[in-house]
Design a protein with these regions (language model features):
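Catalytic cores and adjacent binding grooves of peptidoglycan-active enzymes
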Residues: 14-17, 56-62, 70-161
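N-terminal start-of-chain detector that recognizes signal peptides
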Residues: 11, 35-41, 86-92
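A broad, low-specificity signal marking well-ordered, structured residues that form hydrophobic/aromatic
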Residues: 38, 66, 115
Length: 211
């Protein structure tokens, strides 16, 4: 991509309908070399007291931040797609190296694939704009973890083979049934025919009754 072909604005109908600060555009210009398009959904706004429409964070004042989607070959990148994670990690880390200080993301923040990128106090965040809600993968990427060491998105319990699930089933699951079968194989729990050994039959019957 040449010039600013990598940059697209789709914020004409948004409250924050101003362009990004040239400094932020410069910090994100590496996207052209990666073949990535950045689509600005929410851009800059006037600062408080300047008379223009504005909403939310002061980070967006004068184009100091944008809420954006990233596209590769016409497809929106999404952290829920494992194949996209190395690209997104590279974007986050290169942006930070170029001076971008604030990055927000999360399925429960602005939806899958949408990022806040900009200047302001350094940090990452997720739902509600809170650092405590920043996804683990975003924290790791922001702090420089290699793509292969960044945790997978989501909080789903890792899949376990059926045998391991059974091993954790507890005394009332398959594990308990197995234990019962083991006990049943022990001699003291085997049924003795009264006619073949009357004394043994009575002893075992009494033992089980008192157990």
């Amino acid at each position: 991509m040449t010039g600013n072909d990598w940059l697209k604005y789709s914020n004409q109908g948004a409250t924050r309908n101003d362009p990004l600060d040239p400094a932020l555009i410069g910090a994100m210009s590496f996207l052209g070399d990666m073949g990535i398009t950045m689509d600005v959904i929410s851009g800059g706004q006037e600062a408080a007291g300047e008379g223009g429409a504005r909403t939310g964070s002061v980070r967006h004042d004068h184009g100091g931040a944008g809420d954006v989607d990233f596209y590769k070959d016409g497809r929106k990148l999404d952290w829920n797609n494992p194949a996209d994670m190395p690209i997104l990690v590279q974007i986050i880390q290169t942006a930070k190296a170029n001076g971008v200080t604030g990055i927000g993301a999360g399925d429960d923040y602005m939806g899958a694939g949408r990022f806040h990128v900009g200047f302001g106090n350094p940090g990452v965040w997720g739902a509600g704009g809170k650092g405590a809600n920043a996804p683990a993968w975003l924290v790791a990427a922001y702090n420089g973890a290699p793509a292969g060491k960044v945790p997978s998105p989501g909080n789903a319990t890792p899949w376990q083979p059926q045998g391991q699930q059974n091993a954790l089933a507890g005394p009332f699951g398959v594990q308990g049934q197995s234990a019962q079968n083991t006990l049943a194989q022990q001699p003291q729990f085997q049924w003795t025919d009264m006619r073949s050994d009357p004394a043994m039959f009575m002893n075992r019957r009494n033992s089980l009754a008192m157990g």
